[in-house]
Every structure is written in structure tokens, then in C-alpha cells.
Amino acid sequence: VCTPLDPLKNLTKLERLRLPNTSDNVGACDIQGLTGLTSLTDLEVNCTVQDFSPLQNLTKLQRLMIYKGYSIEGSTSLEGLKSLTNLRELTINLWDDEALSVDLSPLTGLTKLQYLDLEIQSNGSGPAATNLSALGNLTDLRNLVLHIDNITDLSPLRNLKKLQTLEVSTGNQETITDWSPVDHVPNVTKG
């Protein structure tokens, strides 16, 4: 379990915060102490976050990076991110040794996003992320990194006309048979 973040709750004018990885950050991280930091525009968290709801009031956030999401069990809800409509950069890394399922639909309203990096990996047989169609609304995206196990369909990316760079890794390249929906993207990396 990570160090409690409650001592930060009175720093209401804080605009940038980086919570580095420490030996205390090996388990799930309770980010409840961040709820009152409504002036934050830039947040980087290097510990396992399973509940994103404490972030829902941080509506000034323009850059959010969540790393080290190891050993998350079952499904993880991104629902707490849907009110962060000023986000321009979003990075989320979630990994699990068992089956992990993440619904991407809460991201559909984040239409100011220009950079999105989703690394969602699971040892389960189903897709690690569902509802890739939610990304089709993100028409300002210029850079997209998808390291998501077992995705098969890139057609939701067809309308992302501003996309300049796309990096896709599915854990098994044969899962994607049709790359034509991203023919318009100048730089595509299949890995």
C-alpha cells in the first residue's frame, strides 16, 4: 500500500504534482487525498491506481500520467476520468497476471486529447480493453499508442484524420487482420 496522500489535501493552489515510485508504492494506491487539488493541470502518479473516481473533480487537468498499474484484479473503471474534458495528454498503464477488462467508453468525451497512450495488458484470453469505438470520437488525437492485448478491430480509428503517429501492439500480431482503417496515418508502428 502506498503512502497516504491526505497530507496534500490543503495544497489547493498546486498546479503540478509528480508522485514518484517508492518502495511503499507496491500495492494499490489510494488517491483519495487528491480530490481537493482542483488547480492541478499536470499530474503524474507512479503506483497502482484501481479507482479513478477521486480524480473526477480535477477538471483543470491537461496532462495525466498513471504508471505502474500492476496486479489489478478484475475490471477497472475509467469512469472517474470522463469529467476531465480539458485533458490533452493521457497515459494509463494497467497490467494484471490474470484476466483484466477495461471499458474505454468513459474516454469518449475527452475530445481535446492530442496524445493518448494506453497500455492495458492481461494474461486472460479476452480483450484487455473493450469498446475501442470510444476512441473514434477523439478527433484531435495526433499521437496514439495502443499496447492492448487481444484487440482485433482498428475500424474505430478510421475517423481520426489528425492522427500522425500510431503504435499498436496486441500481444499477438495476428489478431489484427485489417489495417486499412489506419491507412491515412503517416507513421504506423506494428509491434
Where do the language-model regions lie?
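Concave beta-strand-loop units of leucine-rich repeat
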Residues: 1-7, 13-33, 39-54, 60-80, ...
